[in-house]
């Protein structure tokens, strides 16, 4: 199987991967591109401009969440209904395009913190499988999947509370492979060395330590301090920033 994460609107790269492989594809969330921290591109830039996005990124990177919220509130000071409609239209267009690249892929897809579940499921082509949280057998492996991001303070739709993440993980029971969008709360895996943010899940870490899956695959951190890290008996591996690399992780490794 091939696992990818953080597609963020990389339509051409995703279409090329689907065309080039006959392996089972697993997509670990964040299909659309709200904001690219490298280029300032994305839906937010179309709504508010790159200078605004640059300031938002600065505030988020510095952990000034209240100021980031205030900055977003300023954008909404105009016609709120118009802004809401423009945002919805851009999201719909983004999902239509990226999900179109999964035509014929027969992929397993979960969600990340930026994803809108209802829209994602509506545009996902027939033959692909959306899984919010649950168990699968893939190529003979017992696989547990739990989508969703960790709380950021910005009330992003795809985020889960710590308690809800723990509840969904607990419902899996033991698995051989754990797939999540977020990393475990391990400093080397949760820290983005470029953005300076840290987004690890304590619930995921506790699950890994308790149930000891052989492998844990995840995304969310685009430029991690470490790609691989052994936690207890589990090899934890970042599936990579697909928008930038166009590559996934093969399991089992060749």
Explain the meaning of each model-derived region:
Residues 4, 9-138, 239-242:
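Core catalytic region of metal-dependent phosphoesterases/phosphodiesterases
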Residues 27, 32-34, 41, 172-189:
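Short acidic, glycine-rich surface-loop motifs adjacent to enzyme active sites
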Residues 3, 25-28, 145, 177-181, ...:
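Structural motif
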Residues 1-2, 135-145, 176-177, 229-235:
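Beta-strand-turn-beta hairpins that frame and shape the catalytic cleft
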Residues 139-177, 196-203:
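Binuclear metal-dependent hydrolase catalytic cores centered on His/Asp/Glu-rich metal-binding motifs
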Residues 6-10, 113-114, 181, 215, ...:
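Histidine-centered divalent metal-coordination motifs
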Residues 79-88, 149-159, 189-195:
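Surface-exposed cleft-lining segments at the edges of enzyme active sites
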């Amino acid at each position: 199987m091939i696992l990818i994460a953080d597609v963020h609107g990389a339509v051409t790269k995703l279409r090329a991967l689907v065309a080039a492989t006959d392996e089972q594809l697993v997509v670990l969330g964040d299909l659309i591109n709200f904001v690219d921290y490298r280029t300032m591109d994305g839906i937010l830039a179309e709504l508010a401009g790159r200078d605004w996005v640059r300031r938002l990124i600065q505030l988020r990177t510095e952990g000034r969440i209240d100021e980031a919220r205030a900055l977003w509130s300023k954008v909404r000071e105009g016609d709120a209904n118009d802004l809401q409609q423009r945002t919805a239209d851009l999201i719909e267009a983004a999902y239509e395009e990226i999900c179109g690249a999964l035509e014929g892929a027969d992929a397993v897809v979960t969600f990340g913190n930026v994803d809108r579940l209802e829209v994602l499921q509506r545009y996902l082509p027939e033959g692909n499988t959306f899984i919010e949280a649950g168990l699968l057998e893939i190529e003979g492996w017992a696989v547990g999947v739990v989508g969703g991001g960790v709380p950021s303070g910005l009330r992003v739709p795809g985020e889960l509370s710590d308690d809800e993440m723990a509840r969904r993980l607990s419902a899996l029971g033991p698995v051989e492979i754990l797939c999540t969008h977020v990393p475990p709360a391990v400093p080397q895996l949760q820290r983005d060395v470029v953005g300076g943010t840290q987004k690890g899940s304590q619930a995921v870490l506790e699950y890994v330590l308790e149930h000891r899956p052989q492998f844990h695959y995840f995304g969310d951190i685009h430029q991690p301090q470490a790609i691989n890290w052994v936690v207890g008996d589990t090899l934890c591996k970042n599936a990579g920033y697909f928008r930038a690399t166009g590559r996934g992780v093969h399991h089992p490794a060749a």
